[in-house]
A protein has these predicted regions:
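Histidine- and acidic-residue-rich, metal-dependent catalytic cores
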Residues: 1-207
């Protein structure tokens, strides 16, 4: 299974049934990775805070989408479902805008599925048209999805996941990607995110 199939299935499965435990863990993981990556890129503290918040909340729009496709059989209506799924970035941005979040955070959430080569969504933006915060979250979101357990597959180990990211490097800003590579090779961020994704977190795991 290639990266495109993994991430597509991840988005569909997430929207069929939003598990708040998993959603919070994924948001925490993306937040940690994004803030560390912003630091690696030399961003200032204010920007690092914004990208950490946006990373935590980047998938909030999925909470509005899941009721529309909940209960449908997974082998039917895939095209329609993907159209719903692709609304989540804009819906998330709309939610945060209504709640008064900083516009930079709103934009990071809105554009976090845009690809550097213009193949992303919702607007097929390319290159530096995409805000740098969204470019940061993009690579962190993909990596986090790959190292997370899903109902249809086990998590990939970090080395395998990074290899899959390399295979799709055209989707990412090369400056951001190279900083991401340095970060995961020289810091403890993988251990920290592994705990967030798979460890026991007081309060989160309590039923």
């Amino acid at each position: 299974m290639g990266l495109a199939e993994v991430v597509t299935e991840k988005n569909l499965e997430d929207c069929y049934s939003v598990d708040m435990n998993d959603a919070v863990r994924h948001g925490m993981c993306v937040s940690i990775l994004s803030s560390e990556l912003a630091s690696e890129l030399g961003m200032d503290d204010a920007f690092i805070h914004k990208v950490a918040v946006a990373g935590m909340l980047h998938d909030v729009g999925k909470l509005q989408i899941s009721p529309y496709i909940y209960g449908r059989r997974r082998n039917t209506m895939k095209i329609e479902e993907m159209q719903y799924v692709r609304l989540h970035a804009k819906l998330g941005a709309d939610i945060l805008s209504r709640e008064g979040y900083d516009q930079d955070i709103v934009d990071m959430v809105h554009y976090h599925h845009e690809n550097y080569d213009g193949s992303g969504y919702p607007y097929r933006m390319r290159g530096d048209e995409i805000p740098i915060g969204a470019r940061i979250i993009r690579v962190c979101d993909v990596f986090s999805a790959l190292v997370s357990d899903r109902p249809y597959r086990r998590a990939f180990d970090a080395d395998t996941a990074f290899g899959m990211v390399i295979d799709e490097v055209r989707h990412f800003d090369m400056k951001v990607f190279l900083a991401f590579q340095r970060m995961i090779n020289t810091s403890d961020v993988i251990e920290r995110t592994d705990y967030v994704l798979h460890g026991s977190i007081p309060g989160l795991d309590e039923k």
